[in-house]
Amino acid sequence: LSIYKFSFKISILSAFATLFLGCFAYQPQHSSSVLFSFITPNLRISDAGFIHKYTNQTQIQIYNSGALVLNLKLAENICINGVCSDYQSFNIKYLRSTHYDEILDNIISKIPIYDGANLQKTNCGFEQNIANKMIKYEVCDNLVKFIDSKNMVKIIIRELQ
């Protein structure tokens, strides 16, 4: 009988620890509210939402009239509204080019793209004009603009205060 009591106590303790630590593990390291525009020939979204940065993933949630219209997760794979693919497949389908895998995460994180090619510092951030790819990328304080004229792709992120 005492073994059953001990097992029961361990089970309860394990369940509590799993529940508590499980919820704790998914807390974002950083969250920001944004106006997010993602305009491509295959997808057109421009609404308000959130960017959540976790240890091993980035998540973008965009809402329209209180309903989730875009749930984009960047981790080992990239998932859009629950449908996952590898980065190259996503880049070809939505960015219409075989960019390197981390380009979308770099844009969201305000990091220079293409190893800082043609990087020009500005008074509020930096800009890059990559002529051979017809890309203009600009980071200025709380505004990020990625415009790929060749492939008709625009990503604009304005962080809200």
What is the predicted function of each stretch?
Residues F24-Y26:
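Bacterial signal peptide processing site
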Residues L19-G22:
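C-terminal motif of bacterial Sec signal peptides marking the signal peptidase cleavage site
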Residues L1-I12:
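Bacterial N-terminal signal peptides that target proteins for export
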Residues P28-T40, K145-I147, V153:
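Terminal targeting/leader modules
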